[in-house]
Structures are given as structure tokens and as C-alpha cells.
Amino acid sequence: MTKNNPWVFRRRPAPAARVRLYCFAYAGGSAASFLDWPAAMHPDVEVCAIQMPGRGSRFKEAPITSVPELVAALGQALAPADALPTVFFGHSLGALVAFELARHWARQGLAAPHGLIVSGSRAPAMRHDPSRKLHLLDDEALIAALGDYNGTPPELLAHTQLMELLLPTIRADFALAERYVYAEAPLDLPIAVFSGRSDEFITEVQVEGWRRETRGPCDVHWFDGDHFFIHPLRDAVIATVERQLGRWNLLQGLQGP
């Protein structure tokens, strides 16, 4: 299921793992966004970073711009093939993809993930913003918008030739998010929500809105950072992931608030 699967990147195979953590990156991100997670994560956790078309080893493939098309492809590629418990972690756009994939599995009658961790993301029912059409901006305006998110190094944004290569995938990711149509259907699994206290793009109400997306428990964790807090606060984020897995009885000895 993960071996020789173009959708899954595992830097450190964990044959004795007790839980598998699928990680979904933000718009413009890739499996490389989680490259340093396996070495820092509890050894009982197998970190599997998702590599979507249009980036990394799949750079020559056309990116997908429809959420239903993407989750259908992911649903087939990641369909459970063993008894190892799985948890989804997604940041920003990745949170939306992880959420919709969990719902897709439920519709298909597949074993649901044991938990969903959504990070840096508005609740899906509160995502729609008709005034926000970043995927329609010209290149200069889109690069300026990326700078506002504070997730891309300024020297990269200033590299004209490199941005010419990256912008089509970034634009496709924004189209994926901005064309998303929400339909209410709460999950039957626990959710944990991670958010930055200084995130200018997400309000506390939009964070708390995730509670309506599950019939199970929903825990909210705040971090002292902006929209991309998962990078500078990596160790704190990973420690909170581990405690959350313990809270869900997937890791022993790590139960915590």
C-alpha cells in the first residue's frame, strides 16, 4: 500500500510501527514539507508524507484542481491494506484534503482513520470567500499574496526563473481550495485542531467551527505563531501530535491534554 506508491513518501520505514501518520501539505507544498518529521517523531509512528501530482518526484504530472477528483485518486491510492491504525495530519489546504479524504473513505465503507488532525485551516463550512480568487491573479500579484502568508522565503519569491516553474502548481492548489463546495456530513472520529495565535487569515470562530464536523470529541491546540507555525515550532507541533495520539490510545505513555 505504501511501497512503490507514487502518492506516498516514507523517509524512514518503520516496520514495527503502531500507528501510521499520513501528512498532507499546504498549497504549493509537497512531501518535502515533512522531510524532517520522521527523525523527530516517536519511533512507533510511521510518517508517510503525501506527494500530490505537480511537485517533487511527480513534478511533470499535471496538478489536480478538483477536490472530488483528488480525493477519489487518494482514496484508491491509500485504501487501507493492513490493520495498522491510521491518522491524517493536514496543514492549511492539506487539512481540507485530509478531511474530505476521511469522508470519502466513510462513503466507500472503508475503515475510517482513527483520528484527524487539522492545522492552520478554517472549518470547511467557513472556507467560502467569494472575494478571494488567488488562482485568478496574475503572476506578480500571486507572488505578492504568497509573501503575505509568510510561508515562502523572500529570496525564493524573488527568483524569477524558479517561480515560473512553481507558480502553475501553486495556482492549481489555490484553485483546488477556492472551488471547493462544502456539504455537511459530520465524521464519526475524533478531531484535533492546531492553530497559530497570530494567524491573520483564520479567526477563533473559524477554528472552533471544526467542532461541528465530528460527532466525536474535538480538541483545540493553540501555538504562538502565524499561519506557518508548523515550521518554526516543529518540535512543539510534533510533541502535541504525539500527545494527541496518546490521548486517542494509539501511543502508550503519552496521554496528555
Predicted features, each with a name:
Residues 1-89, 96-257:
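Domain-scale detector for complete catalytic domains at protein termini or as standalone homologs
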